Amino acid sequence: MAGQSLRRSAWVPLLLRLLLAGIAACEASPADDGAGPGGRGPRGRARGDAGADEAVPRHDSSYGTFAGEFYDLRYLSEEGYPFPTAPPVDPFAKIKVEDCGRTKGCFRYGKPGCNAETCDYFLSYRMIGADVEFELSADTDGWVAVGFSSDKKMGGDDVMACVHDDNGRVRIQHFYNVGQWAKEVQRNPARDEEGVFENNRVTCRFKRPVNVPRDETIVDLHLSWYYLFAWGPAIQGSITRHDIDSPPASERVVSIYKYEDIFMPSAAYQTFSSPFCLLLIVALTFYLLMGTP
C-alpha cells in the first residue's frame, strides 16, 4: 500500500504541470489569432486598426461573386478547354434573283442580264403578311434608296435609304423629299433591318408595314406609286447628291401585289436601243453593202 501511495504522489506534479500548460496555451491563442481586442492578426496588423482592415482585400463568398469569378476565368480547367462562345451572327443572305417575277417583283438597272451583285442598281419587293420586304443593292460605297412618288419627279416623296457609315455599318433611314432636298424623318417605319457593305456595294434588306396611320411623310403601300431609284456617295454617314443627274424611275405605277421582273438598261447600253439609232445603223449597213451607184 505504501508503494502505491508513492507512485500516485509522483504522478500528481506531472498532471499539474500539463494542466497549467494547457491553460496557458488557451489564454495565448486569442492574441495569436488576432481574435481578442488589441490582438495581432496573422499578417502582423492590429485588429482594431480600421485602416489596416481596408488595406487587406476580403473575399466575398456570395453566389454572385462566385459566378462572376467563375465566368471571368479563361479556361474551364488546366487542360485548356475554352468556354463555349456565343454563336456568330448569321451572314447576310444573298438576294435570290431567280425568284424575280415569280415570288417577288424586281427592277434591274445596268448591263443586260445583270443580277443583284452586278447591276448598277437593283430592287426587289414582296409581300410577307402585313409587311412588304424590300431588298436594295447598288454599286456605291455610300447609299442606295427607293422613293415612292405620285409622279416621276423628285419632291414630296417618301424615301427609304440604306446608308453606309464610317464605322462600316449599313443603317436604314427614312427621308422625305422637300423639293430637291432629302430631309431625314425621325419616324422610321422600317423593321427587321439588315445590311452589308461588300465588294464596293451597299446591300440591305428591311420590312415596312403596308398600311400606316395617316402621315404625309409615309405613304400607304397598298396604293400604287411610281418608284424612284437613286444611289450616291455619303460623307460621315450623311447622304449627298446622287451619282447621276437623272436617276431612273419606273415607267408606270407599281403595285406590290403584282410581281414583275423589269430590266432598264443604263445610259451606257441605251445608245443602240434607240429606234432612231437602229434605223441609222440599218441605213449605213445597207449603204455599205450596196455600194455607191
UniProtKB/Swiss-Prot annotation:
Name used for this protein in its record: DOMON domain-containing protein FRRS1L
Its job: Important modulator of glutamate signaling pathway.
GO molecular function, one term: protein-containing complex binding
Lineage, top ranks: Eukaryota, Metazoa, Chordata, Craniata, Vertebrata
Localization per Swiss-Prot or TrEMBL: Cell membrane; Synapse
This protein's UniProt keywords: Cell membrane, Membrane, Signal, Synapse, Transmembrane, Transmembrane helix
Pfam family, one: DOMON
Gene name for this UniProt entry: Frrs1l
PROSITE patterns per UniProt: DOMON (PS50836)
